[in-house]
């Protein structure tokens, strides 16, 4: 059943599909306003009615794509299975045929276009749906526009301009280039992710906030008018043990729930992770990963044990730890046994320098269970294995990576031999970085890292977020944080 705006979207999309003048449809909506639900229902009907032949569902990240794919597939019935062959899921990188390339100058992994996209070159009667468009960088938008200008492409952009933009950009180019009074631009403004009237009201207050006004009283009004107490306001005290937010948070942990505290600064998240871990473990000695810790993945990770995938922001709980000491890689294997040229000798000199660096670390082999994921079911009891550099060795590990990186960069600047240096960078990534999960403790993260995720219970450090001097960015961060909650939302204020 569609609401009024969703039905308008259905009518306008049908009109959009049946015309050839305009190539872009903007479906803009509040966080949790039902954009994906609306598009999935409408485009499914387009396929059934043979108005289109195929749909490419795309997103900027693997995590966002998996969330999208999981939702779309859950709405395909057994009788609709023949439609599955007409629905493709891919990242925008794949759509554009971007491939990961290691830059020989710096060793950084970047995505670059390697050839013309076969998906967009032969796109007649195919539709492209791009979700989370607030996260699309200017480079990606420029590349998409090249194809839009060349081929009969029709794209639906879905997103929310009040969400945080790509890192380093003031606003996503998608939103800043929407023409005035454009006929294929619809805003969904009723929040559907949560059934909580309170959370919807808070998101609305933040979204419509005039930054010259004080917001506290408007939030207090929402709190005072609440009948469900899904929205709470807490005062931050110097003695956190006496704070009602802290007692509430710990109670949820003890009930095996997965609450999260959202902040602006990484240092503030570190503070919350530390005080919560000290309470849970009843110890000041928390310099390592411990049983019952909640962990969150900072990046995609494939376990070397069984290639099990974990996505950015997936959360796990440690149930067992084992520690081994290991030399990460024996660099002497790369020595040229019979150097014949000056280049060979200089290369061997580089390898010897790298070999002298401390390359022995303690590795935690952690048995974990999933407790939160927007991609994979976290209700199962399966035990997974992940490898991490021991917490107490992390600084030394990062220093080693930095030193090796500098040595390889220096060698490249001097000799400019791409083949040799590319091989070294490959070892650097596959032997030293990729086998080990990049994780953080999972009780608190920044609002930026939370984008695209949904949590049952969210606590927001309003004081920390409002310390951002960029008021527009601050508003988007606060709005993003509030929109992560599905059942309970708490604002922590002075």
UniProtKB/Swiss-Prot annotation:
Q: Name one Pfam family in it.
A: AAA_19
Annotated InterPro entries: Coronavir_polyprotein_1ab, P-loop_NTPase, UvrD-like_helicase_C
On the tree of life, the source organism's domain of life is Viruses
Which N-terminal residues, if any, form the signal peptide? none
Give the protein's recorded name. Uncharacterized protein R530
Q: Give the organism, scientific name.
A: Acanthamoeba polyphaga mimivirus
Q: What is the lineage of its organism?
A: Viruses, Varidnaviria, Bamfordvirae, Nucleocytoviricota, Megaviricetes
């Amino acid at each position: 059943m569609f609401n009024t705006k969703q039905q308008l979207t259905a009518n306008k999309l049908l009109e959009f599909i049946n015309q050839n003048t305009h190539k872009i449809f903007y479906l803009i909506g509040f966080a949790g306003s039902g954009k994906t639900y609306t598009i999935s229902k409408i485009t499914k009907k387009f396929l059934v009615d043979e108005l289109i032949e195929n749909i490419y569902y795309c997103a900027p990240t693997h995590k966002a794509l998996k969330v999208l794919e999981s939702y779309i597939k859950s709405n395909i019935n057994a009788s609709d299975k023949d439609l599955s062959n007409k629905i493709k899921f891919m990242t925008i990188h794949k759509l554009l045929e971007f491939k990961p390339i290691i830059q020989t100058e710096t060793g950084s992994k970047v995505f670059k276009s390697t050839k013309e996209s076969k998906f967009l070159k032969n796109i007649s009667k195919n539709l492209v749906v791009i979700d989370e468009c607030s996260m699309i960088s200017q480079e990606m938008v420029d590349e998409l526009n090249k194809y839009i200008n060349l081929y009969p492409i029709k794209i639906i952009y879905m997103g929310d301009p009040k969400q945080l933009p790509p890192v380093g950009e003031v606003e996503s180019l998608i939103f800043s280039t929407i023409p005035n009074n454009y006929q294929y631009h619809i805003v969904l403004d009723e929040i559907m992710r949560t059934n909580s009237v309170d959370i919807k009201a808070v998101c609305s207050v933040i979204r419509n906030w005039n930054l010259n006004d004080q917001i506290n009283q408007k939030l207090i009004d929402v709190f005072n008018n609440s009948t469900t107490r899904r929205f709470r306001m807490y005062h931050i005290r110097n003695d956190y043990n006496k704070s009602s937010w802290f007692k509430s948070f710990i109670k949820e942990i003890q009930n095996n729930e997965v609450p999260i505290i959202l902040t602006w600064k990484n240092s503030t998240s570190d503070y919350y992770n530390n005080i919560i871990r000290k309470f849970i473990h009843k110890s000041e000695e928390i310099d390592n990963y411990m049983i019952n810790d909640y962990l969150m993945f900072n990046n995609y990770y494939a376990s070397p044990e069984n290639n099990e995938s974990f996505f950015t922001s997936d959360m796990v709980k440690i149930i067992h730890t084992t520690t081994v000491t290991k030399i990460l890689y024996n660099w002497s294997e790369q020595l040229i046994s019979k150097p014949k040229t000056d280049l060979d000798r200089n290369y061997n000199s580089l390898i010897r320098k790298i070999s002298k660096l401390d390359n022995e670390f303690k590795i935690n082999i952690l048995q974990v269970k999933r407790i939160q994921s927007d991609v994979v079911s976290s209700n199962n009891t399966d035990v997974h294995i992940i490898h991490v550099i021991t917490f107490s060795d992390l600084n030394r590990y990062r220093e080693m990576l930095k030193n090796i990186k500098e040595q390889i960069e220096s060698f490249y600047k001097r000799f400019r031999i791409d083949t040799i240096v590319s091989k070294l960078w490959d070892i650097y990534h596959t032997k030293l970085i990729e086998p080990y999960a990049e994780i953080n403790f999972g009780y608190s993260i920044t609002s930026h890292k939370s984008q695209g995720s949904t949590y049952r219970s969210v606590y927001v450090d309003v004081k920390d977020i409002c310390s951002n001097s960029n008021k527009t960015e601050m508003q988007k961060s606060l709005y993003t944080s509030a929109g992560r909650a599905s059942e309970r939302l708490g604002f922590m204020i002075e």
